[in-house]
Amino acid sequence: MARDFPLERVRNIGIAAHIDAGKTTTTERILFYSGVVHKIGEVHDGAAVTDWMAQERERGITITAAAISTSWQDHRINIIDTPGHVDFTIEVERSMRVLDGVIAVFCAVGGVQPQSETVWRQADRYSVPRMVFVNKMDRTGADFLKVHGQIKDRLKANAVPIQLPIGAEGDLSGIIDLVGNKAYIYKNDLGTDIEEAEIPAEMADEAAEWRATLMETIAETDEALIEKFLETGELSTEELKKGIREGVLKHGLVPMLCGSAFKNKGVQLVLDAVIDYLPAPVDVPPIQGVLPDGKEAVRPSDDKAPFSALAFKVMADPYGKLTFVRMYSGILEKGSYVLNSTKGEKERISRLVVLKADDREEVDALRAGDLGAVLGLKNTTTGDTLCTQDDPIVLETLFIPEPVISVAVEPKTKGDMEKLSKALVSLAEEDPTFRVNTDSETGQTVIAGMGELHLEILVDRMLREFKVEANIGAPQVSYRETIRGSAGGEGKFSRQTGGKGQYGHVVIEMEPGEPGSGFEFVNKIVGGIVPKEYIKPAEQGMRETCESGVIAGYPLIDVRCTLVHGSYHDVDSSEMAFKIAGSMAFKDGVKKCNPVLLEPMMKVEVEVPEDFLGSIIGDLSSRRGQVEGQGVEDGTSKISAKVPLAEMFGYATELRSMTQGRGIFSMEFDNYAEVPRNVAEAIISKNQGN
């Protein structure tokens, strides 16, 4: 079966922004104007197509990245609508990894918000070309050029307006296209009757000024264009389009558009710009990966290249497990067998589907550049590579942040125990930032995630989708342990109880590892003083002790253990004896290496009316917070601070009462930092049951 659209006419794009900028509404309008839906769905009505989970429709926020296919002007556009809430950062992260271009949506009133900066950084991490849509131009206080200034100052982006609004707030009547040097006037509420017109006389000077700025910016990218611009002071529409496209693809330029998705103004022009300026799969660098021999390789976006794809999302579904894939090269056919090269396992492709939110269309094949979903994969999880068995490759995977908050969870009735464990396994498969552990001492099941809302929604899903009622404990901070010094450690396990005894003996050197390295084991045993078969058990003993911690029972991170010496007994030594000896040596070493406790620090942004500034700063300081910046804009004070997560539980309620309900805040994980000695002592003492 041939392709519906040539690769040059495919666009894989994401719609991303902070909460309430209007991402989902923008996506809904795109689907309406491109004919996928025939009725406009509103987020606040709970009718949005891309918000297909019950919780999304109730809360009016997007939680999971819904993937939808549509077409516009003979181009295939695959769209991913991403969540704006920081607790769902993994959803944004995984969509950025598989996209070729992004529409960043900003609110014309709120401008650049803390979460916008997070999303922008994620797009930077994966070098995703982008354009900006300044939405909500119909709202009171809307200011397109103020947002332009904020994007340049805060995001350090070369943002260039290619449109201007005609009117603003309640008087938004149309849009000036600076590239084509004309105006579009909206004649009806649905935004389907649009008149192409001359630029209104009262805006002619402003439009000419911004068009000159646009031409100058484009001319600077090309010597031939500079000469023409200096001679004639003019560039053609085609030259401008070509220059903008090249600037976007090289990450040197971010075109800015404007409108109001809710009032149906400007959305068709956004679709035109997606086709004109955002890349096709063939325009972005080929995906990189590693071959079985360790050499780096690339896979070009081409149906004729060997098949390779990345699983970027796994979802439980009434019909079985859905694995979303981004096709990078080759063709994937229904009924074929492929290799999961990340895990080294064979998988069968039972069915292939293309999604339109919760509607789906079965297809016989997916091709290079496609976004689709596979049914029937047994062992594939987020970030795994699928490829042909004859030409294996492992593609670059996703950046997955560590969870920072945990709660104990137990079923309300004994009979729900099995249902609870099934639900937790299923949810953890879908979401790599959601972890499930069993506390070895208490036997409690502990779930960990990126924030209170994240865990709240997962518990809610257990009830709705898996019919499991659960009791939830109070949120707990996910502390970590580490070492600051270096020392030796020794563990000797010797037991004689009649008959065969037990004997294992290891000596290690311990030192801090690189940040982010976790636990690192180095074997420097020579001459067989510790036989080969006992080295792995010794390492296992160290690794398990590392996971359960030494000073307060929290995982130990960034430590390197080098096995340097030891001894064994011909008869009495066993794998278990060396595992215990490894654990003993590890504990001995940690105690001599100045162990410390680490806690998650959160980047907190608070916005309050000016009158409350002093009390908010005082409150943050009392929470062991460090204020890193503050400013006032239009009577609103903005404070940015770093505060330990342990001090932030219940902050939303506190902030409401301190500001009479007029303060808002956002919070995201920043880094792990050492806990002050007096606080650490209290935590250690509590955990040791003193």
Curated annotation (Swiss-Prot):
Gene3D superfamilies reported for this sequence: 3.30.230.10, 3.30.70.240, Elongation Factor G (Translational Gtpase), domain 3, P-loop containing nucleotide triphosphate hydrolases, Translation factors
**Functional description taken from the UniProt entry:** Catalyzes the GTP-dependent ribosomal translocation step during translation elongation. During this step, the ribosome changes from the pre-translocational (PRE) to the post-translocational (POST) state as the newly formed A-site-bound peptidyl-tRNA and P-site-bound deacylated tRNA move to the P and E sites, respectively. Catalyzes the coordinated movement of the two tRNA molecules, the mRNA and conformational changes in the ribosome.
Kindly list the GO molecular function terms attached to this UniProt entry: GTP binding; GTPase activity; translation elongation factor activity
* Keyword field: Cytoplasm, Elongation factor, GTP-binding, Nucleotide-binding, Protein biosynthesis
Asked if the Swiss-Prot or TrEMBL record annotates the protein with the keyword Nucleotide-binding, the reply is: yes
Instruction: Spell out the HAMAP family in the cross-references.
Output: EF_G_EF_2_B (MF_00054_B)
UniProt cross-references to Pfam families, sorted A to Z = EFG_C, EFG_III, EFG_IV, GTP_EFTU, GTP_EFTU_D2
Supply the PROSITE patterns for this chain: G_TR_1, G_TR_2
GO BP terms: ribosome disassembly
What are the residue boundaries of the tr-type G domain, all occurrences included? 8-282
List, alphabetically, the InterPro entries matched.
EFG_II, EFG_III, EFG_III/V, EFG_IV, EFG_V, EFG_V-like, EFTu-like_2, G_TR_CS
Protein name (record): Elongation factor G
Its main localization is: cytoplasm
Cellular compartment(s)? Cytoplasm
Q: Name one GO cellular component term.
A: cytoplasm
